[in-house]
Amino acid sequence: MRLYRDRAVVLRQHKLGEADRIVTLLTRDHGLVRAVAKGVRRTRSKFGSRLEPFAHIDAQLHPGRNLDIVTQVVSIDAFAADIVNDYGRYTCGCAMLETAERLAGEERAPAPALHRLTVGALRAVADGSRPRDLLLDAYLLRAMGIAGWAPALTECARCATPGPHRAFHIAAGGSVCPHCRPAGSTTPPLGVLDLMSALHDGDWEAAQGAPQSHRSYVSGLVAAHLQWHLERQLKTLPLVERFYQADRSVAERRAALIGQDSECG
């Protein structure tokens, strides 16, 4: 079979034998691809460093029966350099990569929209100019939208009556009107569903102006919605949540100390 080229994001890798690795790629035109990268663990490897997770590459591959073979790699974006040295960015990026793999569908099914979204999200994480929690929730919402799982935010998930509606029910598919509201629905604080819509639509001015309490609530709803569709939690999300909790605790203590200094002055 003929060689083929495609742009790809390296999602993960694991060892094979003494010198090789198996890499999982999210490609633009061939979807999820698993391939053997021969000799990349040797110090003389020509492209071992280009096949690390978070890398955006142009790859040439040879189709195989079970696994393809990587024959050439050209680096497009080396996001890892700005992600792996910051634990907050790293956990956020790992959650994105895991989500991409879970939502990519069958192997070799073209995934141009998910590939484009993932590249843009990793670029934003590496850049560090936007809050990581908002970037992750925006990515998860949009990735679910590509998969057909986006929660209803502006209309009732059951009868499509235009909103806004106050109630939200995961199994029903998002916001629900008073007539369709099932038992067990939650009523998020005012502004929470607006924040979810802003993240989904890319209204960063509105998203970044939301209070931290709303951001935390949104993270819980988004994670629960994704978990319900995947039927299990992402392995990386607990790491993200623990980091954000610790990060917020430090920020709160810092704010308290600043307040004390102001009062003493």
From Swiss-Prot:
Gene3D superfamilies for this protein: Nucleic acid-binding proteins, Recombination protein O, C-terminal domain
Residues of the signal peptide: none
GO cellular component: bacterial nucleoid
InterPro entries linked: ARFGAP/RecO (IPR037278), DNA_rep/recomb_RecO_N (IPR022572), NA-bd_OB-fold (IPR012340), RecO (IPR003717), RecO_C (IPR042242)
Keyword Magnesium (UniProt): no
Entry function: Involved in DNA repair and RecF pathway recombination.
Domain of life per record: Bacteria
GO BP: any one term: double-strand break repair
Name this polypeptide is given: DNA repair protein RecO
Family statement: Belongs to the RecO family.
Keyword DNA repair: yes
